[in-house]
């Protein structure tokens, strides 16, 4: 009895053979369907124009699309074909910029299939030229390169070359009309690659004299075959648009062997170009019987010839009727592309904002102030404080926007994502000032009453209010730099705000590169009365009749947040250094960081004499100081805890 391991090996071999045969039969039973096609104007509009330095070190200046069209280097002929030529009028300096030419690249990368190019004319057999129709993967040489049509100088036969990484050997015993001169496609052969020399007349002058023809490449995971058909010998199935490679006959190149084509040749973009001299044409210039102006340097002789003989390159042009890509089971409505090749199509970085309960700041509830209902589930960041935030009674918190940050809608406990081209982190600044009725639409919010939650000032002092600013993106879309998630800051007997006494948030200013210079004025002045003084142990609040903020912007740390809470409340973090006027007439310098909630109440008139109240907590130093206005009016002081209250009482 045979060992079980032997039986398993035999069974695996039989199974593998059956699977391979089945796959081959399935492939043979399929037909190629058109997946991509270009002709005429689509070459100009749907391909990228490469205008960088020549990777092959040629004496060439590749031009962009606009210049190529204006100068006539690319155009659509009367017959509808695509013309792509070179400058054949300018005499050049051999030590200057190279001859103008065009290199176009497909925008997408493509995988296995049947590639068909119908060429009416290709660059002729001209000294110094190096035309090519080829493909290359994103990561050279690992993803491979396929040179379908390539030749230099006076050559009249095409050279088909494959390049890839490692070792990739193909057999010379495959049936083909061309001649295999190198069987190693990988780096083991240096930069030579595996090379098949085509039949005479497959490129250059003889190709053009016979009216051009069609090249077809079949690329699978096991082989690459390339056919050349002169104009008079194009297969009927190919001409009808229903290609059947089994009727194509013997290919010019049949590259197959121990090389793993599925691993060595990945998705490729197509390239058509004409360069001059360079690493190949320049180095073999002397071997091509081209004129040697410098016997010691074939390369310099090539450059001299190209620079000083413009008329020689009148025939160095491509005229292409079409390029088509066929694939199994892929309709023309589907894309054969596997990825985008241009930066303009790259997916952007996703930016998300998350509402976190642990970062929710708590503010004391004033006894007689108008407050804004807190959102039950959603925080919506407005895209523009002036244009997009409208008054609403919905339970929504509106944050004024900063230019350059994305619009983010965040659901509590979840994410909302936005695409952009890149991600940055920003620190915003904000300026708050009273505005007239016509500007009150800049902050959204409602006039609904809300019950008090009994939050005390002591709780405020102990609450962490660090709220990280979300990532922003340079997408050019307006958005917000922070989201303030305030706990239910409510009051008893909340009043409806007067239309003439709304205090709204101004648009966020541009991001400062450095903190602003101190301004020699108090942050806020106004008139007050004793009835607005807070009733809590450590709550510091007052009624502000005409609040104003210094003209300079105040930087908000990245760990803070600034928001307009509804239409009548504003919560912000401030940091500044000010000269504070004292009741005695002297001034005191004070550096302060404060978290304040401004809640305007009903006004007395439209002249700005309305009473408004504010809640303020300060970690350390004086932020608002007493200012005298209209005799008996006073303003409360922002200090920490009981010391602040005692200090206010002493000043009073």
Swiss-Prot record:
PANTHER family according to UniProt: ENDO-1,3(4)-BETA-GLUCANASE XGEA, GLYCOSYL HYDROLASE-RELATED
Glycosylation sites: 64, 200, 208, 453
InterPro entries: ConA-like_dom_sf, GH16, Glycosyl_Hydrlase_16
Residue ranges with Polar residues bias: 390-410
Residue numbers covered by the propeptide annotation in the UniProt entry: 631-652
EC number: 3.2.1.6
Protein name according to UniProt: Probable endo-1,3(4)-beta-glucanase AFUA_2G14360
Known role: Mixed-linked glucanase involved in the degradation of complex natural cellulosic substrates.
Acidic residues: bias regions: 529-540
Signal sequence coordinates: 1-21
Compartment(s): Cell membrane
Disulfide bonds: none
SUPFAM superfamilies: Concanavalin A-like lectins/glucanases
Native species: Aspergillus fumigatus (strain ATCC MYA-4609 / CBS 101355 / FGSC A1100 / Af293) (Neosartorya fumigata)
Alphabetized PROSITE patterns for the sequence: GH16_2
Molecular-function GO terms, alphabetical: endo-1,3(4)-beta-glucanase activity
Region of interest called Disordered, as start-end residue ranges on this chain: 379-423, 509-551
Residue numbers annotated as active site: 145, 150
Domain GH16 intervals: 36-289
CC terms in the record's Gene Ontology section: plasma membrane; side of membrane
